[in-house]
Swiss-Prot record:
Residues 349-369 have a biased composition (Low complexity). It comes from the Eukaryota. Coiled coil: none annotated. Gene3D superfamilies: Ribonuclease Inhibitor (3.80.10.10). Belongs to the SPS2 family. The GPI-like anchor contains a phosphoceramide lipid group. The anchor position has not been determined. InterPro entries: CWI-Assembly_Regulator, LRR_5, LRR_dom_sf. Its main location: membrane. Residues 344-369 are annotated as: Disordered. GO terms for cellular component: fungal-type cell wall; plasma membrane; side of membrane. Residues 1-19 form the signal peptide. Keywords: Cell membrane, Glycoprotein, GPI-anchor, Lipoprotein, Membrane, Signal. This is Protein ecm33.
Length: 398
């Protein structure tokens, strides 16, 4: 009995010390050396935020740790070459790396769940050692890295997915991704980037800039914008897409085919402009556009046989010799309710705001391209939709 009298309090005290050594909620733990990291090797779970000191040099490994109940971050660690955590399976908050300019290895073979990913300025990081793959994350932002692919990012759902300025990035295939609750954005990556989202069925906003291929065969509906600027793919197909917000195809130099056979509703503006190789626009199921229809270019055919309601402006101009008869009738029958213009065989086709509708137009409409792009303002938003106007302005700035 006497032994128990003293042993039990001692054991409790030892447990308290061990718990304290594994961090506390809202505490920041600074790791300045491998010995600092080894001090937590007896911890299955570390509580609080782990910050890797920017002055640390070489490799750092977190052995035996399975869970971080906070953030794992490093900012400005210019001499850190490797970060590893062989057994870590979850980071509850943010996995943040910024300015690790010599980092070549990121080894987290057991990691499957992250609160969010924020990686910026990791130019020497060419691949990920994420064997199991991260299948759960809130927002993912990856900017200015040397990654050639995103193998190891195997998300089922995501909030924002923002992939920009990764100039070595050749391919992205997020096979398991089914839903996105925030913006999906690709911009400024390698011009030959191919994006495959084979099982994505729903989302909010999706924007693609300077990509060579986009595959979204399962996409069914978007609540926000779907936009393409300056891409180099020849064909875009969304066979199951029925509804989206603003829809934009702007300055895609090689685009010859747009296939959206199931599209019925555009909740916003619908802009097709400056796609000089596009000769035909066929939208067999389109019924409703709540914003403006604004098509300009070099196309010879335009077909929207089921069109029932265009609430905004209708501008259709092309160098091609198509017929306006169907759309004249739709305007007279009040199917098209806004300001109406349809012009075939127009040498200098323009958008509804006067910007050039082709990349080779000359004369007044060509010079109008810059001035009118610069004049986009809130007065234009109700007809075309905010996101489409914003996208057009961004493309002009770029």
């Amino acid at each position: 009995m006497a032994f128990l009298k003293y042993a039990l309090p001692a054991l409790a005290a030892a447990q308290a010390v061990l718990a304290a050594n594994c961090g506390k909620t809202d505490e920041t733990i600074t790791i300045s050396s491998q010995s600092d990291a080894d001090g937590y090797s007896s911890c299955s779970t570390i509580k609080g935020t782990i910050e890797i000191d920017e002055h640390l040099s070489g490799a750092i490994t977190f052995n035996n740790v399975k869970q971080i109940d906070g953030t794992l971050s490093c900012t400005g660690g210019a001499n850190i070459s490797s970060i590893a955590a062989p057994m870590l399976n979850s980071i509850a908050d943010t996995f943040k790396l910024d300015g690790l300019t010599t980092l070549t290895t990121l080894s987290f073979p057991s990691l499957t769940s992250v609160g969010s990913i924020q990686w910026t300025a990791l130019p020497q990081l060419q691949s990920l050692d994420f064997t199991k793959g991260v299948n759960e994350a809130g927002d993912v932002t990856i900017t200015n890295t040397g990654l050639a692919n995103l193998n190891g990012i195997s998300l089922n759902t995501v909030g924002k997915f923002d992939i920009t300025e990764n100039t070595q990035l050749k391919s992205i295939n997020i096979n398991n991704l089914k839903n996105a609750t925030g913006l999906i954005n690709f911009a400024g990556n390698l011009n030959s980037l191919e994006v495959e989202l084979p099982n994505l069925s729903s989302g909010t906003n999706m924007t693609f800039r300077n990509v060579s291929a986009v595959s979204v065969p399962s996409l069914h509906n978007l609540t926000g914008q779907l936009g393409f600027w300056g891409d180099t793919f020849k064909s875009f197909s969304a066979p199951n897409l029925t509804e989206t917000g603003d829809l934009v195809f702007n300055s895609n130099s090689k685009l010859t085919n747009i296939s959206m056979p199931a599209l019925e509703t555009v909740n916003g503006g619908f802009l097709i402009t400056r796609n000089d190789e596009l000769s035909s626009i066929d939208l067999p199921s389109l019924k409703v556009v709540t914003g403006a229809v604004d098509f300009s270019g070099k196309f010879d055919e335009v077909s929207m046989p089921k069109l029932e309601n265009v609430k905004g402006q209708f501008n259709l101009q092309s160098t091609g010799n198509f017929s306006c008869d169907t759309f004249d009738k739709a305007h007279n029958d009040k199917v098209i309710r806004g300001t109406y213009k349809c012009k075939a065989a127009e040498p200098n086709p323009t958008t509804k705001d006067g910007s050039s509708g082709t990349t080779t137009s000359s004369g007044s409409s060509a010079s109008a391209s810059k001035s009118n792009a610069a004049d986009l303002n809130a007065a234009n938003l109700p007809a075309l939709g905010f996101a489409a106007v914003f996208g057009a302005l961004v493309q002009y700035v770029l």
